[in-house]
A protein has these predicted regions:
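Cytosolic regulatory regions of ion transport systems
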Residues: 1-165
């Protein structure tokens, strides 16, 4: 996750990571970070989950993700959650459990590579971003892939947000 993106918008963030070196580097960079495994009881409390407005889970480990969500909801039922997954099946399961956003990490990586390739061929940023966004919402393999039993959804980029500056 890109902690600096939140800091540049003056949004509070606390990172929990089980990699001690990464935690130290984050702290050295001014990012509040806690060393530990968020799927272990007590860690989310230490991170202030009770005051959180959003839980972002970036681990690709499905069982760990489910456990983190379970623990977080014990502390703060209804917490908005965004998660990284490794499969469409996991996306479907997490969405059925009320997760706000579940994305397949490898797919989002491929979108980033495709965007770079489009830029490299001289496609404008506006057209490249539109092409990538169209892939996301078209059902052609995006995080927002529509299953037959579900209505079409909008990608977060298309949802109404606070007015742009």
């Amino acid at each position: 996750m890109r902690a600096r993106a939140f800091q540049t918008q003056d949004l509070p963030i606390i990172v929990v990571d089980k990699d001690r070196r990464r935690v130290e580097a984050l702290r050295d960079g001014g990012v509040p970070a806690i060393y530990g495994d968020a799927s272990t009881p007590g860690i989310l409390e230490a991170a202030g989950m009770g005051r959180a407005r959003l839980l972002v889970i970036a681990t690709p480990e499905g069982l760990r993700t489910r456990r983190i969500i379970e623990l977080a909801r014990l502390i703060k039922p209804g917490i908005d959650t965004a998660v990284r997954t490794q499969s469409d099946a996991e996306v479907a399961y997490l969405e059925s459990q009320g997760v706000g956003l579940a994305i397949v990490g490898a797919r989002e990586l491929s979108f980033g590579l495709a965007r770079y390739a489009l830029f490299s061929f001289g496609v404008s940023a506006k057209r490249a971003n539109a092409a990538i966004q169209n892939e996301r919402i078209s059902g052609a393999g995006g995080a927002f892939e529509r299953r037959p039993d579900q209505p079409a959804r909008e990608a977060p980029e298309l949802r109404r947000h606070a007015d742009d500056d």
